[in-house]
Amino acid sequence: MSYPGQGGNTYGGGPPGGYGGYNQQDRYGGGGGNYGPPQGPPPGQYGGGYGGPGGGYGGSGGGYGPPQGPPPGQYGGSGGPGGYGPPQGPPPGQRGNYGPPQGPPGGQGGGGGGYGHPGMGNQAPPGQYGQPGPPGPHGNHNMPPQGNQAFGGTQGYHFQYSNCSGKKKALLIGCNYIGSKNALRGCINDVHNLQRYLVQRAGYKPDDMVILTDDQRDQRSIPTKQNILQACQWLVKGAQPNDSLVFHFSGHGGQEKDVDGDEDDGYDECIYPVDFQRAGSIIDDVLHDILVKSLPPGCRLTALFDSCHSGTALDLPYVYSTKGILKEPNLAKEAGQGLLGAVSSYARGDIGGALSSIMGTVKQATTGSGANQRAKQTKTAPCDAISISGCKDSQTSADAMEGGTATGAMSFAFIEVMTRDPNQSYLSLLNNMREVLRGKYSQKPQLSASHPTDVNLKFIM
């Protein structure tokens, strides 16, 4: 099978190459079949991959064997986390009607650079980052409060922050779409750079990571739709309060017509696995069902998306401005009741006024309050999930060159800011990432959360 696509070096803007007729209906399934060996370096695993002869996903983090054939339209055949049934098919006329992705900003895309650093195996990577710089101008930030955080009065909504003191697991995915005319250069590098950062700076172990990149020869380590979905299930399996999970995707992203009415703009955001032409994309609803709804209160999920149209790629309903306030204050008036009212009550001091006006907003409802109401009622979650994405839902994300190495602009900015000064709040991290990108890229990183969040708290993972 050939790799997908035609076009330039941005991370998406619809299916790479604008292929029509690929299978969107198999939203939860894997897309099995024979996947030809990818081009790339000699055999070997990049960091705690899918383990050795035993076949399970790496390390002590799970017991999944080799991926099975695709289930009939569901997670493993009998419904996914939370008992979700088979999704509806796409509306007529919406299959792949997207043009090729736009080229990168002038002078920024593509060029040079191999795959960067080799895999780490079971050893910690060599030191690549300098010593942390002096503390930034943001001062010390408070750690998140512990225990159940109630909001909404009699409506009884609640969530729990994670202190990230439990088990740490990571799933890192990089799709360069090797061999296609629409190939990207920086996505595999993004994975290795983030893996190195997590091990050296954040206390993660290679044995507790699954790495999916399309330069590997082990078929279980290729970022196909089936492998990505099964690895997502590995990531959340056995999650406990105060655990810390990382999901990272670098590759092509796009938008598809929304079929369940939860999107304010009428489109679901999606990511494209390397076999998207046969197996279809993975939409935000599916990622949310697996990665967010299955987590217990107090379990942290940090999702990092370096792809086009990724602003709400995990479908988290509370979206933050760079000032940490409502982007669209009139949305509170639109809601009338439900979670937006609950959020307002929470902001007024249900837990001691910790949030003040530092609140997010449910995604803007341009198709009426119905989509807004549905999103806020079904997407708010008691776990501690946040998403940092490379750009707004309407933007493309650049495949960039930094220091002579191909990289995703968002991934570079995140590692740069956190390496320079790890003492960041959610708000300072968002603003400092935007500052790193300012003047070079038009994209604006986005921050969203599964519950109303005090964005002045210390960012931990």
Swiss-Prot record:
SUPFAM superfamilies according to UniProt: Caspase-like (SSF52129)
Record-linked InterPro entries: Caspase-like_dom_sf (IPR029030), Metacaspase (IPR050452), Pept_C14_caspase (IPR011600)
Cellular component annotations (GO), alphabetically ordered: cytoplasm
Compositional bias ranges of the Low complexity kind: 121-131, 138-148
Keywords: Apoptosis, Hydrolase, Protease, Thiol protease, Zymogen
Ranges of Gly residues composition bias in the record: 1-21, 45-66, 74-86, 105-119
Top EC group: hydrolase
Protein name as it appears in the record: Metacaspase-1
Function according to Swiss-Prot or TrEMBL: Involved in cell death (apoptosis).
